[in-house]
């Protein structure tokens, strides 16, 4: 889900070819930009966050979990912190494709759902204010 930058068109074509060659078109959809992302998360069996560059905070994962989706992601950056706390079953060692496949199968067949989201704006704001208050006291 999401737009494709011009610099990533070849990569998208490669992914689409791979999906086609594995006969997975009925399982994997490339949607492009969408305004109804919450609805997409709600009907998704699994949401993947497999960015090679570690993100400081995985907002897409928080959004997906808030919609009740299971999430699988690399064990680095913000993804690691979020999944460790909310859905540790979805953590995969960076670039370990066999582990990714195994984890995906386990998550897909499991009834486990992510824990309640603790990364809310209200909670994080209160934590920041508490930190500042402790520093000035």
Q: Where are the language model's segments positioned?
A:
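An anion/phosphate-binding loop that grips the pyrophosphate of nucleotide cofactors and donors
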Residues: 44
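A short hydrophobic beta-strand element within the catalytic core of glycosyltransferases
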Residues: 47-49
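Short hydrophobic beta-strand element within catalytic cores of glycosyltransferases
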Residues: 70-73
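A charged, aromatic-enriched C-terminal amphipathic alpha-helix characteristic of glycosyltransferases
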Residues: 108-137
């Amino acid at each position: 889900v999401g737009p494709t930058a011009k610099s990533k068109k070849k990569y998208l074509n490669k992914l689409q070819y791979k999906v086609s060659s594995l006969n997975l078109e009925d399982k994997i959809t490339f949607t492009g930009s969408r305004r109804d992302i919450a609805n997409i998360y709600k009907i998704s069996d699994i949401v993947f966050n497999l960015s090679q560059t570690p993100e400081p905070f995985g907002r897409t994962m928080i959004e997906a979990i808030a919609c009740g989706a299971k999430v699988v992601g690399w064990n680095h950056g913000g993804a690691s912190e979020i999944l460790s706390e909310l859905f540790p079953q979805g953590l995969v060692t960076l670039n370990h494709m066999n582990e990714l496949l195994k984890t995906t199968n386990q998550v897909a067949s499991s009834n486990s759902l992510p824990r309640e989201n603790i990364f809310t704006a209200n909670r994080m704001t209160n934590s920041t204010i508490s930190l500042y208050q402790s520093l000035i006291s």
